Amino acid sequence: MRKKCIVIVGPTGVGKTRLSIFLAKRLSSEIISADSMQIYKYMDIGTAKVEPKYQRVIKHHLIDIVEPYENFNVEQFKNLCIEKIEEISSKNKIPIIVGGTGLYINSITHKLEFNAVKSDDKLREELENISLQYGNEKLHEILEDIDPKSADKIHMNNVRRVIRAIEVCKLTGHKFSEINDKFDHYNDDYDFYIIGLNDDRQVLYERINKRVDEMIDEGFMAECKYIYEMTDENSQSIQAIGYREAFMYLNNKISFKDMISLMKKNSRKYAKRQLTWFRQDKRIHWMNLKDFREFEDIEQICLKNVKEWLYDKR
């Protein structure tokens, strides 16, 4: 019998963490984070990391496992996540994977071998030099010439991802977007119940804007300064939305006002990209907050549906 696993996805600021904690309490589950930035230590405010009081009540995995100056990739996540799924399942508990990093989620819910294309250090160094000498826009133009579909999906400031896409194209002769299309193959090694949360776009965007203001009030800039001391501008960790803009401000490249504006703008764009990504998976059971009076209604419906799925009552 296939092991069962609950997955909760959706854009930033929609309530994924809240729903995961609600379900975990009532199902005696453990939670696996699928957030590419919550893996980093000390990056708490900017990643909306689960508060310690909740982590003490419910076991959370794959949070605070990497130093900010270290690199971490999706293949490493996949391997660790599978380990945790097996570990939690061995205790007769249901794992709950929650996060908004589409590639991390798909590495588990879909079939794709990430080690099929190895890195080329020489090529990577050449591409990094192009970025340093001519800027991210020039590097992004190279990707646009060879793989327009990937260029459309990957922001030019996500240098690490742009380089990887170019690298795959040049090493394999195939477009990076074509390889990603293999995500159409679902992973049937596990029995997944995937919940997708969404909301009215304007309401979601207003919540995101408010969240940025709250981050600043909670001491986000002090957090950034602390991380800044142990990283450099090429560190993978500070490519995250919020941190990237903060470091531009700390390096006197933009004003504080422009930093706030960019953080909000880029967070909204990211939420839009997240929805576009997740909508490709037809297995997702979508719950739109605008269709319910209270979030508690969504919690109760999800709990009911999950229990029916767990015990095969439908």
Swiss-Prot record:
**Keyword Transmembrane helix set for record:** no
Reaction(s) catalysed by this chain's protein: adenosine(37) in tRNA + dimethylallyl diphosphate = N(6)-dimethylallyladenosine(37) in tRNA + diphosphate
* Record has Transport as a keyword: no
Q: Specify which residues bind ATP according to the UniProt entry for this protein.
A: G10, P11, T12, G13, V14, G15, K16, T17
Q: Which Pfam families match?
A: IPPT (PF01715)
Q: Which cofactor does it need?
A: Mg(2+)
Question: Would you say which domain of life the source belongs to?
Answer: Bacteria
Q: Name one GO biological process term.
A: tRNA modification
Ordered alphabetically, the record's keywords are: ATP-binding, Magnesium, Nucleotide-binding, Transferase, tRNA processing
SUPFAM superfamilies documented for this protein? P-loop containing nucleoside triphosphate hydrolases
Instruction: Name the EC number(s).
Output: 2.5.1.75
- Stored InterPro entries: Dimethylallyltransferase (IPR039657), IPT (IPR018022), P-loop_NTPase (IPR027417)
Q: Under which main EC class is this enzyme filed?
A: transferase
Marked site, Interaction with substrate tRNA, at: T101, R124
Sample GO molecular function, one term: ATP binding
Which intervals of the chain are annotated as region Interaction with substrate tRNA?
Answer: 35-38
Which positions are annotated as binding substrate? T12, G13, V14, G15, K16, T17
PANTHER family given for it?
TRNA DIMETHYLALLYLTRANSFERASE (PTHR11088:SF60)
Per UniProt, subunit arrangement is: Monomer.
Q: What does this protein do?
A: Catalyzes the transfer of a dimethylallyl group onto the adenine at position 37 in tRNAs that read codons beginning with uridine, leading to the formation of N6-(dimethylallyl)adenosine (i(6)A).
Annotated family = Belongs to the IPP transferase family.
Name it.
tRNA dimethylallyltransferase
Q: Which species does this protein come from?
A: Finegoldia magna (strain ATCC 29328 / DSM 20472 / WAL 2508) (Peptostreptococcus magnus)
Instruction: List the gene name.
Output: miaA
